[in-house]
C-alpha cells in the first residue's frame, strides 16, 4: 500500500541526499570556530594568569574573536536553511505531500542541487528511512512513521549533547571561579581573564537554549504522532494530508536551526540509534 522504502533508493532521491550532505558538510566545516573557541577558553585565561602583562591584549583578542565567531554564525545559518530545503524536497517528493511555499519559500534549483551532489563520493545513503516501514502499511501511516523517525532519532541525540554541554560549561567555569576566589582576584581582573572565553560561553549557552527548545517541541509533536498511531491501531483511522503537512512543517522549522550537533558526537551513537529506531518501529507495528 506504499512504496516509500523502495522509492527512497531511486537515483533522484539519492541525489537529494548527496546534495544535502554536502551542504551540511560545508556548514560543519565552520565548526572549527567552535573548536578554536573552546581551546581559547582553556588556554588564554591560563596564559593571563601566568603573564599578567598581557591580560589586556588577551581580553581584546577575545572580544575580536567573538565578533568573528558571530559573523561565521550568519554563514552557517544560510547553509543550514539551504540544507533544510533540500531535505524538504526529498521528503515531500518521497511522501508525495504538497510543498509549503509560504514556510519553505522556493525550492533549491536543479543546477545548484546537481552541482552539490557531484561533490559527494560516498555510498552510504541507501535506506534513509527504516526498512521496518513495511509496504503493506497504509501510505499515511508509513509517512507518519518516517516523520516519527525524524523526531525520535534527533531527540535522543539532542538530549545527550545538551547534557554534555552543561557538564562542560559548569565544570570549566566552576574551576576558574573557584581558582579566582582562592587567589582573591578582583572582579575587573576576572572579567579580563574570562573575556577570551566569551565565544565559548556564547556557543555553549546558545546551543543549550536552542536544543532545549527543540527537545520540548519534539516531545510535544512526538506525543501527537503517537496519539495518531494509537487511533489507527484502535479503529484504523488514518491522518489526512493536512495533518501530515503540519507535522512536516515542524520538522522543517527545526531543521533550519543552525545549532547542529558535531559529527564526532553524532557518530558515537549512530549504530545504536539506528538499532533503536528499528526496534521502536517494530514495537509500534505489533499494535497494528
Where is each model-derived feature located?
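Cytosolic/matrix-facing juxtamembrane and C-terminal tails of multi-pass cellular membrane proteins
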Residues: 2-13, 17, 22, 209-287
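Short N-terminal secondary-structure initiator segments
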Residues: 1-16, 61-70, 133-155
Amino acid at each position: 500500500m506504499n512504496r516509500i522504502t523502495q522509492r527512497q533508493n531511486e537515483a533522484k532521491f539519492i541525489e537529494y541526499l548527496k546534495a544535502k550532505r554536502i551542504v551540511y558538510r560545508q556548514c560543519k566545516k565552520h565548526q572549527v570556530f567552535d573548536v578554536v573557541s573552546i581551546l581559547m577558553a582553556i588556554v588564554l585565561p591560563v596564559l593571563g594568569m601566568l603573564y599578567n602583562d598581557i591580560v589586556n591584549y588577551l581580553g581584546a583578542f577575545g572580544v575580536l574573536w567573538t565578533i568573528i565567531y558571530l559573523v561565521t554564525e550568519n554563514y552557517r545559518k544560510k547553509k543550514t536553511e539551504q540544507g533544510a530545503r533540500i531535505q524538504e524536497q526529498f521528503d515531500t517528493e518521497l511522501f508525495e505531500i504538497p510543498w509549503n511555499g509560504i514556510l519553505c519559500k522556493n525550492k533549491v534549483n536543479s543546477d545548484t542541487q546537481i552541482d552539490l551532489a557531484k561533490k559527494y563520493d560516498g555510498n552510504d545513503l541507501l535506506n534513509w528511512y527504516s526498512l521496518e516501514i513495511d509496504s503493506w502499511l497504509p501510505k499515511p501511516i508509513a509517512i507518519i512513521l518516517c516523520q516519527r523517525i525524524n523526531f525520535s532519532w534527533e531527540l535522543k541525540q539532542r538530549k545527550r549533547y545538551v547534557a554534555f554541554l552543561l557538564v562542560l560549561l559548569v565544570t570549566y567555569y566552576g574551576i576558574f571561579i573557584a581558582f579566582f576566589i582562592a587567589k582573591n582576584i578582583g572582579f575587573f581582573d576576572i572579567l579580563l581573564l574570562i573575556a577570551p572565553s566569551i565565544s565559548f560561553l556564547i556557543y555553549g549557552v546558545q546551543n543549550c537554549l536552542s536544543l532545549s527548545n527543540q527537545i520540548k517541541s519534539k516531545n510535544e509533536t512526538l506525543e501527537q504522532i503517537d496519539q495518531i498511531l494509537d487511533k489507527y491501531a484502535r479503529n484504523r483511522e488514518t491522518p489526512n494530508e493536512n495533518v501530515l503537512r503540519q507535522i512536516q512543517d515542524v520538522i522543517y522549522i527545526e531543521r533550519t536551526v543552525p545549532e547542529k550537533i558535531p559529527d564526532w558526537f553524532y557518530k558515537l551513537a549512530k549504530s545504536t540509534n539506528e538499532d533503536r529506531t528499528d526496534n521502536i518501529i517494530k514495537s509500534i507495528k505489533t499494535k497494528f
